[in-house]
Amino acid sequence: MFRRALPAARNFGSQLRTTRTFSLSGALLAETKSSKTNRFASKYKKSSSGNKNGPRHDNAPKKFRQGDTRTKTIRFNFDSGSEKAKEALKDLIKRVHGYSPNYQVQFVDPQTNKLRKMHLVELVNSTDLDKDGLLMVGPSSAQEMPLVRTIRVQDMIKEYSDRLALAKEKELLASGSVIAQRVINKRMQAEKKKSATKMLALSWSISVSDLMHQKKNEILKRVDNNEKFIIFVGEKESLYSARNSVEKEDGIASQLGTSRTKWDRMDEDELAMEMKKREMIFGKLEELLAECECKYDVSGSLDARMMLNVTPKPNVSKASEKETEVSARELKRQRMLAKSREAAKAKKKIDEEDLDSLYSIKIIE
């Protein structure tokens, strides 16, 4: 009996060891699993200890970093105007960007003549380059925006061409060009001559015929050129001195109180006749200036010398002359188009009548 039960006891012992081993392995596995879970939990706890609102999700808004760039496409449209007008406008856009990188400008509203902040792309895209242009005035400080206003497209092109010519002159001067230096000297002399005070000198002894013909034509010429000028009236001996002192400050004004007329040698009749003639000369001058619609200031006196500082009325005819010419050309073009349309309609009608007649002939046949 005892011997037979021995194998069974041995088997029971091996099973017992197996069970203990299995239980121990399971405990180790459970402990290992628990420790891994706790390790990740503690790691997560450490990483999220400063976040009171919980973990950050992928759909949460990200902070804008300094290295990131956000760009907005700005499109300027050039649907009208000549190539020169487009070049001038593109140059203006480039210069505005130099002062204002975001293209914000102060625009002079032509309707109200007030400033309002605008984006340059709005102005450019709403400008008809066939008739209008833009002019920019640079700001006086970095805090200000450039000033932009509407002008005629011809003036914009001229301003652009003048700046290109000036830049070319500076480039030639920097390279030591002698020709450029001569051109600049000639232009400076012409500008000095143009800015010089224009004077028309008359003598008290001038005849009414010469005054109303020769001198009148000279006055009308200056008025047509819209030039400010001075009319000096005195004795023949004083005209040379007046011409030389016209550019000096108060040069002519200092001579108005003096006279070389020999009043003390005249009798009453001669004195009355001389004063009457001077009154007539001065009256004719006033009539002539009133006819030209000029403004003038009078200095001096009839018994000495007189000066009339003349300012012509602004001449708008020359400013509108080109516009009138363009309007006339446009009207002529419209008439030609209308005639061509009428001719085309007439030809079409004749062709239709010919076709109808041919068709009727075929039917009769």
UniProtKB/Swiss-Prot annotation:
<feature type="region of interest" description="Disordered">
    <location>
        <begin position="314"/>
        <end position="333"/>
    </location>
</feature>
<comment type="similarity">
    <text>Belongs to the AIM23 family.</text>
</comment>
<dbReference type="InterPro" id="IPR029427">
    <property type="entry name" value="AIM23"/>
</dbReference>
<feature type="compositionally biased region" description="Basic and acidic residues">
    <location>
        <begin position="319"/>
        <end position="333"/>
    </location>
</feature>
<dbReference type="Pfam" id="PF14877">
    <property type="entry name" value="mIF3"/>
</dbReference>
<keyword id="KW-0496">Mitochondrion</keyword>
<feature type="transit peptide" description="Mitochondrion">
    <location>
        <begin position="1"/>
        <end position="40"/>
    </location>
</feature>
<protein>
    <recommendedName>
        <fullName>Altered inheritance of mitochondria protein 23, mitochondrial</fullName>
    </recommendedName>
</protein>
<keyword id="KW-0809">Transit peptide</keyword>
<dbReference type="GO" id="GO:0005739">
    <property type="term" value="C:mitochondrion"/>
</dbReference>
<feature type="region of interest" description="Disordered">
    <location>
        <begin position="38"/>
        <end position="71"/>
    </location>
</feature>
<feature type="compositionally biased region" description="Basic and acidic residues">
    <location>
        <begin position="55"/>
        <end position="71"/>
    </location>
</feature>
